[in-house]
């Protein structure tokens, strides 16, 4: 088992009833389980943590010319190399109705892992490179893993509970 705490985060369409959102989220968790059952992180979450965070993912539309926000968010998460479980509901025209992914405490525990509070350049938007690098490397042993964690923290700030 890992020393991390995990939560299963997921996005669902805004226009489903709360019970339908929960059911679709559950379907996606089953898909995640099918693909990642033997992963250490999944086992830690399933045996010890068991927390769901269901977020409003906006619209769903599989049409390539006008994809829904849920579909676009899924693409973003996959492009970051984050393992996902996704579900498309046959009774809703096979539209994407949920996707889920595990998040560890470095993303959601802002008390133990605070946001960047270092210096900024004169434009007040760009963090001082050395300060920022030192801050982000507290999250992981590799820069790639630290960048993934920082990306998830930034990504999840955009959502509200479903």
Which residues fall in each region the model found?
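Sterically constrained small-residue positions within well-ordered secondary structures
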Residues: 1, 44, 90-92
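Glycine- and Gly-Pro-enriched alpha-helical subdomains that act as flexible
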Residues: 2-38
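Short basic, glycine-rich beta-strand/loop surfaces that mediate nucleic-acid
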Residues: 9-11, 48-66, 70-162
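Residue-identity detector for glutamine
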Residues: 20-24, 43-44, 80, 95
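Short amphipathic beta-strand starts and helix->beta connectors
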Residues: 33-41, 79-86
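Active-site pocket-lining segment
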Residues: 37-51
């Amino acid at each position: 088992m890992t020393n991390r705490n995990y939560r299963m985060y997921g996005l669902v369409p805004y226009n489903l009833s709360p019970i339908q959102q929960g059911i679709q989220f559950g379907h996606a968790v089953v898909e995640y389980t099918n693909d990642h059952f033997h992963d250490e992180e999944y086992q830690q979450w399933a045996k010890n943590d068991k927390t769901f965070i269901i977020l409003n993912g906006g619209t769903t539309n599989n049409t390539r010319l006008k994809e829904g926000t849920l579909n676009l968010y899924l693409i973003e998460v996959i492009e970051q190399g984050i393992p996902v479980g996704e579900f498309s509901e046959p009774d809703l025209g096979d539209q994407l109705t949920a996707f889920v992914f595990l998040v560890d405490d470095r993303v959601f525990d802002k008390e133990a892992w605070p946001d960047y509070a270092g210096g900024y350049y004169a434009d007040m938007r760009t963090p001082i490179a050395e300060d920022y690098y030192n801050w982000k490397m507290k999250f992981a042993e590799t820069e790639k893993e630290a960048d993934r964690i920082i990306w998830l923290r930034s990504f999840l700030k955009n959502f509200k509970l479903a």
